[in-house]
Structures are given as C-alpha cells and as structure tokens.
Amino acid sequence: MKTLSIDIETYSSAPLSKCGVYKYAESPDFEILLFGCSADGGPVRVVDLACGEKLPPEIAAALTDEAVVKWAFNANFERVCLSRFLGLPVGTYLDPAQWRCSMVWAAAMGLPLSLEGAGAVLGLEKQKLTEGKELIKYFCRPCAPTKANAGRTRNRPAHAPNKWAAFKRYNARDVETEMSVQERLSKFPVPESVWEEYQLDQEINDRGAALDLTLVRQAIAMDARSRRQLTAAMKKLTELDNPNSVQQMKRWLAENGLETDTLGKKAVAELMKTAPEPLGDALSLRQQLAKSSVRKYQAMETAVCADGRARGMFQFYGASRTGRWAGRLIQMQNLPQN
C-alpha cells in the first residue's frame, strides 16, 4: 500500500466551529462513527465503527506507517481525530509529514475550500451528496430531548436505520469525490515546497500556545463586574429599563434635546464634544460599555485543550491563490491590536 484516502464521520458534544478540532476530539463522548477509505485508488470501503465493526489490520497499520501517504480533504480534521482514536495522549498527534491535504491542493488551484464547492467547479461526475448536512446534524451532534424521541439526547444508528444506511453512502461518496478531485488536479501538482510548508504549519498548530487560564478567567470576571456597574450607573442616570437598547437610548436623548440617527462609536464620540450634562455622562458610560469586550478571552476559554494549550489557531492556505494563512478561533494575529 502506497496511498490511503480517508474520510471519517464523527460524534462529539463539543461545538466544532467554536472550539476547533483539537478540543472537539478531546470531548469524553467523542467517537468516530464511520471510517471510509480507499487504498491505492481501489474500491471504497466503509467501516461501521459505531455498529461494532473494526478497522482491517492493514488499514490500522497504514495509519502510522511512514511509507503510506494518507490523503483527506481538510486532512487536519482526520489526522487529529484519528490521533485520539488511536489513543495518543493530549499534545501528541499523527505525524503530518505522512499526510497530504486535497483541500490545500484545491486552494492552490484557486478552487473553493469546501469539497462540495470544489467538486461543483470541477464538474465531477460523482458530486458530494447534498443530504449530508441533515445526516450530520442528526447523527453527529447532540439532539434536544423531546416526547417524540423518548427524551434522548443523541441519535444512534438503531433510531433511524434508513438514515444510517444513507449516512454510510454519504461517507463513501465523500471518499470518491475526494479522489476525483485529486485525479482532476493530477496534471497540476503542488510544489514539494508547499507540502513542506504545510507540514510546518501542522506542527505549529499541533504545538499550540500555552494560555494563562487564571488571567483569562479573571479578565472575563472583571468584565462582567464592570458591565454590571456601568449598566447600573446608566439606569440610575437615565431611568431606562434597558439603557443598552439603542432605541430606548435614542429616545431618551431626543426627549432631552439631543437628536441622533445612530449610536455608533464615531457618532457617540462626536456627540460627546457638545452634549450637555447629564447627556454627556450617559454617552460616556455607553462608550465605556462599547469598549468593554472580552470575546478573545472567551474564545481562549472555549478553545483551550486539557493541557492548557490552545491549538489550531491558523489555517494553511486560508486564502485561495495567494496562499496566505488565515486566523482561526482566537485570531492571534490581532493580539497587538487588542
């Protein structure tokens, strides 16, 4: 075996878009449901791990075999999730040097960063199945307990056998579509230097950055206390039920002789230059509330892994054609501005 194309379907109660794949795969309830693969471009097989099937020994061995190149669309997801599946400790991941990402290849050719989008632009015969989004929502995320579902918080294969069969077909089609993307782009290879940069990028993302969680949590707590104090001061000054309401604040200002169409940052700064008291004080308090933002600290708290490090902060080739990386989660490139 020289190459192994992989696509997996997973379950985790952690919100992937908010916490990133590293934290997502650390969730105690994380598991790989389906493992779709093709060895050396051969027939696609789907291993139903959720229903008790096991990876064939040769496939399991290939995951750590440096002689086998592993391919996936957004390979970072598969690599990190499979690292947890194989029982590697937090902070240890499968070697990115053994992986290639067809999403990076597509981006280098100016194609969309989604498998569905890339397949559509390339006009592939086997497109990504559109029903996948609903199936992922059904099987891969927690569900709300209702009378209709007997109060369960997770949908399993036995709860909808027909949907599960469709989900397996979806998984197989993803592998086929990913291989079709590779085949279509084979005449336009990515320079080896790009794959070397990709490996370095993955090592940086795997290593992450240590966070001072005491500082993070205290900053969030201080912000909450400050917002309570500022809001209380505004209520006392304006006698409004909700002084944070733009409409209520604009009406209060108008009733006190100060008309304005907007309470944007620049508009408030201009109004403060001429506003009489107590209008000036109210605008000053509102400006302080607007400045108070700890979203970056909240993002840190959401994304931090069990060992106190935040990972997956950068996406390689986040911008098509130019190849510029893109910030993710905490947006660390903005720290000097914050």
Placement of each model-derived feature along the sequence:
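Active-site-proximal helix-loop-helix substrate-binding element of RNase H-like nuclease domains
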Residues: 27-37, 41-186
